[in-house]
C-alpha cells in the first residue's frame, strides 16, 4: 500500500506527502530527517491519510493536492469538518 498523508504542526502548518511506510515516514518527520519539514519543527501530528494500491495513484493524488488550489482547499475543508465537527 501507498499512503498520501497530511501532517499538521502546532503552528497550523500543513505538510502533504506520500510514502509506502506511513509510520516510519511520520517518525522521520518528527526526528528532523526530512529536509522539507525540518524548518517547520518536529511537532507533527497525522491528521489525514488516503491509501492506494498503486504508487502512481498516490503520487498523482499528492500532486493534485499540491498543485490545484481547489483540490487543496477541498481537502482542508474536509479535514476541518472532520476535526471540528462543523
Locate predicted features.
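Structure-specific nucleic-acid interaction/processing domains
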Residues: 1-16, 20-86
